[in-house]
């Protein structure tokens, strides 16, 4: 499986009720998944936990057979080889502009990455 969630909970400080509770799912590489539900049901919280932008309070998230989140242990978002595009987008605030641009440039030489970053910065 490419993505596996096992009994994932997401909790926000000061909130009695979890934003996400006991979610389990699996997706194979190339498979498309859809999250639907009313506003406030936890869709964005779950996606943020998968992307590493929110810690999980229980359960675990596995990407490409590697555990990337579980209670007390979360791989940084830039090490997950995935990202999200939000309606109100933002960059990774802890990365430089160049590193934000390079985030999606996997499998390229440093020279090719530098060239692409320079190209994008000229736009």
Regions inferred by a protein language model and the residue ranges of each:
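Conserved structural motif at the start of ABC-family nucleotide-binding domains
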Residues: 3, 18-20
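ABC nucleotide-binding domain "signature motif"
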Residues: 57-68
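ABC-type ATPase nucleotide-binding domains, specifically the catalytic core motifs of the NBD
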Residues: 13-14, 95-113
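ABC ATPase NBD coupling module
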Residues: 67-83, 107
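Helix-to-loop junction immediately C-terminal to a conserved catalytic motif
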Residues: 51
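The feature captures the beta-strand-to-loop junction immediately N-terminal to the Walker
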Residues: 36-38
